Amino acid sequence: MKHLLAATLATFVLLSAAGAGAQTLHKTSLAADAKAYRKDGARHIYATYADQIYKGKLPPLVHAIVVVETELDSGGNVRSVNMIRVPTHAPDVTERVREMIRKASPLPAPTRMGGTRYFEVWLVDKSGRFQLDTLTEGQR
């Protein structure tokens, strides 16, 4: 149990900004595998886009479902975003999700894995608000 808990907890490390002497907060994931990392990645996306999260249970039919494979380097920088399943009726959603992931970089650094690839399912409502399958509140 301790190992599982440690794998999903994230620690904060203060890093000096180059040449400025200022301090920047950088999040590090202690996940030991891609499955455990999903929660850290999802929490980071939720924190980055808090105003765009769909609150409560999603409607029975969501507007779009996007399945994404994200590859990160050891520092949490996004190396690639591969769309595994895309909504053909809503290509704008696909591009928006891709751009949101890139702009959220760096994600928590997967230091125990030296980089990772993980999958996430984005559930997008007609309003444009979303939930990630990892942290979804379910559907009505």
Locate the predicted segments by residue.
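Bacterial N-terminal signal peptides that target proteins for export
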Residues: 1-8
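Short, small/polar residue-rich loop motifs at catalytic or cofactor-binding pockets
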Residues: 60-67
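N-terminal signal peptide c-region/cleavage motif recognized by signal peptidases
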Residues: 15-19
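Acidic, negatively charged sequence signal
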Residues: 56-58
